[in-house]
Amino acid sequence: NYMTTNDNGKNDYLIIENIERFPENNLEIYNRYGVRVYKTDGYGINGNVFTGYFQAKVTVDKNEKLPTGTYYYILNYTKHDKSGQTQVIKKVGYIHLENH
């Protein structure tokens, strides 16, 4: 996953394919030091996406761009099957963010 914060319409936010099929989700993003820099519920719903800005601590300005680097994410989402069973799925991965 590759992102930029240059607002050119390409790679401007984290795309998680088909996440709209699982609205019961939460996403956390951490920097290389393990500090959470982003947290949200309902990722991908109504424009709720990660655009490379701080959004987890009240001590940091939410309008401040994150520095270039690799970030790690944890995505949890609830999956309901046809029989009515519910399963919570956990996915982890990384994002490379370029801040120009």
Predicted regions and their residues:
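Short loop/turn motifs at secondary-structure boundaries
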Residues: 1-100
